[in-house]
Amino acid sequence: MKIIHSADIHLGSKIEAKLPKDKADIRKSEVRQAFNKMVSYAALHEIKIIMISGDLFDSGVPLKKDKDYFYSVVRNNPDIDFIYLRGNHDIKEICLENIPGNLKTFSEEWTTYIYGNVSISGIELTENNYKNAGLRLDLPADTTNIVMLHGQHDKLPINNLKNADYVALGHLHTFAEIESNIRGKCVYSGCLEGRGFDEAGTKGFVVVDTDKIS
């Protein structure tokens, strides 16, 4: 099975601080276009899961038009599960009555979604739960285990996740593979679209092949 790992999309980012309004509006549309292209890639290649490891939105109180845009993309792709872990910039509350059925979310306790022999677990870390979070997740040795986390890697409970085959990280805006003592890989996908000169270079997402990581 193939899964997309993405993060740090920052829908609704206020790019006006660095650009005139007309050019900022163009850049905002390009952020959406990058997200659309990723979803189209998934549909074209029959990838059924898109992981978003935090900072889908740029604000904890995103504009209605940005939420509506995201929900419309999810609803228009019912064959794809969007697994969304909120990050430090993200929307604080999700109205569970309105979210599409194929949008999967997390909380401040570990949540696991099962797809055959593949488990995808995640937790939204806070000051109250991050110190012992890794000790509360039991990853079986005989399954392919993916873990989603958002934050600076040296402050995350990665080394407690011994049986993790792939840790899908968000927070850094460039691709990076982090050293750890888990049995698999620990990866920042980077952002989909750079929003300024400080985010130059190749951007995009990671395609995870579960047959090759376990």
What are these regions (language model features)?
Residues 49, 58-187, 191-203, 209:
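His/Asp/Glu-rich metal-coordinating catalytic cores
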Residues 1-68, 141-143:
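N-terminal active-site segment of His-dependent metallophosphoesterases
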Residues 210-214:
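A short C-terminal boundary segment appended to hydrolase-like catalytic domains
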